[in-house]
């Protein structure tokens, strides 16, 4: 992860000023979204992973991951991580990166986009975050042994919008003989699985950030909520639950950061990246189940109300858990790798992390 405290502080300040969950809860409309997006775009955060020669900020992979983790701490309900991922994909396919919001497809392992012999795109992809709000959709495509990236104008696709568990916009996107603005091969050693692993790591970092936020919320509530003439934090059962929540949070943050560091520092070590990123998505997904249950237990009925901000974090965690493969899907792939390598290779694989 990035050591650039100025970047982290600047990102945090933007979110504190324009994306405070309590202020969003009280907002009467969505006008705050455009203000927030403008601030992020003007600061260069939306194009952090786009090289300078493509008009971006040219930040490192580690810097981008730090931006994403901070976004998770605020449960940012706009397509910043998706736009960062879209910019990374396009620039790694030598495609000029447009301004504005981007969605990335597919985010479900079984969904596919295909290229017809005439060059048009076909396929149906489900649950695409922020597709209805995006200006462009970036599609990753497996084609004849290579991986292609396509930039598509959203208005050329059929968008069937719905709300995710958190209320944030999602959509089923239908590509029906759609002409892309540009289609190029993904460069270097990057593959279709690389895209999935990058997406999984991004969601793991967001999950880790959001779990840090709900740990703070639950701990503060336990210190101030009085029952039987003393704060509930004094009760052993509550202390035990908070300790479990802290453990889940620490594990999620550690494994997500480990995956991010591997992607940033060993970009050509495909097996290490797969092991780290798949493990991160499995472990953070498990932490979502345990952590959100505990947070709602500690806060009780108030945590379920529309007025309280806890649901802004927990419901987004439930959404993020399934994006780019849930823990069950990644566990199958990770188990297959371990079985393929054989029992003798398992211990060295674990101890060299």
Where are the model-predicted features located?
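Phosphoinositide system proteins, centered on phosphoinositide phosphatases
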Residues: 84-85
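FAD-binding core of flavoproteins
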Residues: 75-78, 88, 92-212, 216, ...
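RNase H-like, metal-dependent nuclease domains and their acidic two-metal-ion catalytic environment used
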Residues: 81
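Alpha-helical interface subdomain recognition
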Residues: 1-74, 197-353
């Amino acid at each position: 992860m990035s050591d650039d405290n100025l970047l982290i502080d600047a990102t945090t300040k933007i979110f504190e000023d324009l994306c405070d969950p309590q202020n969003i809860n009280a907002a009467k409309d969505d006008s705050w979204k455009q203000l927030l997006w403008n601030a992020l775009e003007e600061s260069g955060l939306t194009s952090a992973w786009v090289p300078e020669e493509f008009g971006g900020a040219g930040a490192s992979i580690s810097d981008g991951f730090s931006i994403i983790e901070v976004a998770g701490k605020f449960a940012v309900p706009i397509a910043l991580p998706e736009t960062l991922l879209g910019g990374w994909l396009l620039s790694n396919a030598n495609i000029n990166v447009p301004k504005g919001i981007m969605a990335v497809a597919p985010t479900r392992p079984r969904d596919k986009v295909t290229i017809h012999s005439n060059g048009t795109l076909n396929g149906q992809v489900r649950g695409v975050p922020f597709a209805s709000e995006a200006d462009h959709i970036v599609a990753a495509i497996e084609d004849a042994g290579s991986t292609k990236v396509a930039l598509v104008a959203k208005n050329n696709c059929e968008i069937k919008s719905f709300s995710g568990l958190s209320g944030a916009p999602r959509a089923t996107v239908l590509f029906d003989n759609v002409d892309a603005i540009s289609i190029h091969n993904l460069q270097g050693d990057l593959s279709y699985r690389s895209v999935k692993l990058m997406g999984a790591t991004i969601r793991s970092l967001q999950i880790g950030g959001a779990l840090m936020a709900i740990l703070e919320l639950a701990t503060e509530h336990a210190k101030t909520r009085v029952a039987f003439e003393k704060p509930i934090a004094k009760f052993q059962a509550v202390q035990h639950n908070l300790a479990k929540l802290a453990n889940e949070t620490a594990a999620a943050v550690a494994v997500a950061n480990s995956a991010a560091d591997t992607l940033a520092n060993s970009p050509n070590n495909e097996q290490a990246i797969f092991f780290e990123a798949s493990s991160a998505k499995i472990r953070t997904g498990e932490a979502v189940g345990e952590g959100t249950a505990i947070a709602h237990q500690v806060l009780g009925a108030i945590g379920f109300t529309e007025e309280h901000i806890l649901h802004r974090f927990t419901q987004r965690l439930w959404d993020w858990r399934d994006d780019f493969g849930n823990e069950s899907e990644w566990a199958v792939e990770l188990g297959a790798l371990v079985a393929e390598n054989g029992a003798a290779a398992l211990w060295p694989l674990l101890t060299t992390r």
